[in-house]
Curated annotation (Swiss-Prot):
Quaternary structure and partners: Homodimer.
InterPro entries, per the entry: aa-tRNA-synth_Ic, Rossmann-like_a/b/a_fold, S4_RNA-bd_sf, Tyr-tRNA-ligase, Tyr-tRNA-ligase_bac-type, Tyr-tRNA-ligase_bac_1
Presence of keyword Calcium: no
Residue numbers covered by motif 'KMSKS' region: 237-241
Subcellular location: Cytoplasm
SUPFAM superfamilies documented for this protein: Alpha-L RNA-binding motif, Nucleotidylyl transferase
Gene: tyrS
Keyword terms of this UniProt record: Aminoacyl-tRNA synthetase, ATP-binding, Cytoplasm, Ligase, Nucleotide-binding, Protein biosynthesis, RNA-binding
HAMAP family: Tyr_tRNA_synth_type1
Span of domain S4 RNA-binding: 351-416
A biological-process GO annotation: tyrosyl-tRNA aminoacylation
Source species of the chain: Cereibacter sphaeroides (strain KD131 / KCTC 12085) (Rhodobacter sphaeroides)
Domain of life: Bacteria
Name under which the protein is recorded: Tyrosine--tRNA ligase
Family the UniProt entry places it in: Belongs to the class-I aminoacyl-tRNA synthetase family. TyrS type 1 subfamily.
Amino acid sequence: MTYHPKSDFLRVMQERGYLADCTDKQALDEALSKGVVPAYIGYDATAASLHVGHLLNIMMLRWLQKTGHKPITLMGGGTTKVGDPSFRSEERPLLTPDKIDENIEGMRKVFARYLSYGEGATDALMLNNAEWLDHLNYLDFLRDIGRHFSVNRMLSFESVKSRLDREQSLSFLEFNYMILQAYDFLELFRRYGCRLQMGGSDQWGNIVNGIDLTRRVLEGEIFGLTSPLLTTSDGRKMGKSAGGAVWLNGEMLAPYDFWQFWRNTTDADVGRFLKLYTELPVEECDRLGALQGSEINAAKILLANEVTTLLHGRDAAEAAEATARAVFEEGGVGGALEVVELPATTLGEGLSVAHFLVAAGLVASGKEAKRLVAESGLRFNNEPVGDANAPVTAATVGEELKVSIGRKKHKLVRLS
């Protein structure tokens, strides 16, 4: 039997497809209906930017704020030093404190695009769990917190069990991660009255640990809510493309390439992605997702424009669309294509096409470049390139050279 939420937030989560599991849906709905509920999602600082795989949870925080509640973005300055073992086949490399701080700064820029931070009742908070984790006394922590955890139960969580079943090592350092994340929820409840933790469904075990700990220590009524682990209709994990991670920071992925990622959405995913990654009405998302044939291309452009506008602004989205039109329909260049600067000294008196592509960072290897040429997948200034050993000189590049790899990847190369 379908539950019909009273609260705007839970209704949005259910209608738009964000909701996978909830520890107590009716009690949470009641709390959300009565007043402001602070809720958090934790982010370990393992990279200099978040990627598209994080975007679904960021949109959940955005909807939380839009429906009158308080989002908390918790930076894992402390837990990143340990590393989350959930569903990983090997231990994460350890990062230096300086690198962790640098990564947090990169993530901060992304959150500022989606959430309004400040001191008001529903303004977002950005916190760092290093604030309380860095100063823990180990013996006190074991006595006061560790005694509430059952190792038997921790070993039963699928995220850990799957690793042990494959006879892969799980360090004591990583095993502690679950306790530290649970402690985060306790501290957030104690300090900020935070009553809800959200995350991907792979975090269910960690979230439940935090709820159990907080109830035992502080007798708090708190909740957990998870989103589905999203894949595309053809089974690919969200956040990845053929060219690698789809980063949210403009310095790591040009707005045009971000726009193009969404424009290339498969037909079967359009309606679902419109509901999850834009703020268009659900009925409109369903209508657009049901379009067939060439008509659905307009819906894909709308999807790309809406998602890019949220992250990079309306001007960047319009520039990306104009560039795509110039590149694909008119064979031109457009103003938003990413520019690759190649030192003139690297080019020297000339490189082969294969070596030129590698030097410019457009392919990973000479072998890949040769395969690209052999499959007629390379063009310079819209002209097919048929010889991977042909010379590329300064005269070839000129003021700038438009390099097209396949039908959808286009860059401008300039000599510096």
